[in-house]
Amino acid sequence: MPRLLAPLLALSLLLLASGAQASYITRTLNKPVPGGVAVVDLGPATSAPSARFDGKPVLVVKEQDNWLAIVGIPLTQKPGTAVLNQDGRTLPFSVGSKKYPEQRITLKNTRQVNPNPADLKRIDRELAEQIKAYRSFSPALPSNLILDKPVNGPLSSKFGVRRFFNGEERNP
């Protein structure tokens, strides 16, 4: 038994040391699944590198001596290897799978599930405004990467739930 103790202790210390090397941002935000966030280490540099995922710019922040790319992963992303492009080089990262909890809602007003043509016209107009906002990108650092709870009070439902309205899945 004492002969097993030394290798077990060495392995434990190695595992602790490897976990300690991950940055606070990585430990807190890195949940690389569809609908999650990947934190990709870009390494050290004198100025902020530029990074893109799926042709779109991503937030780059500095923590200690390294730059990190904060990559939002679409819900439609297939599990497997994804690629971040950073100043001419490609950085692969793994996207895991995730089974989201489901919520099934039955609505009496079917227009809220399958809108009529007038509703669709308004929805399309509002969607165009949303897409315009989504396409804008500011390299300015946000005041807080770790989001705070928006309000105190009872939680009506968790974020990250697949919703079905009258049996039909809808985007959140």
Describe each region flagged by the PLM:
Residues 1-6:
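Positively charged n-region of N-terminal signal peptides that target proteins for export
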Residues 7-16:
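Bacterial N-terminal signal peptides
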Residues 22-92, 97:
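Cationic-aromatic interfacial patches
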Residues 26, 92-172:
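Surface-exposed, glycine-biased beta-strand/turn segments
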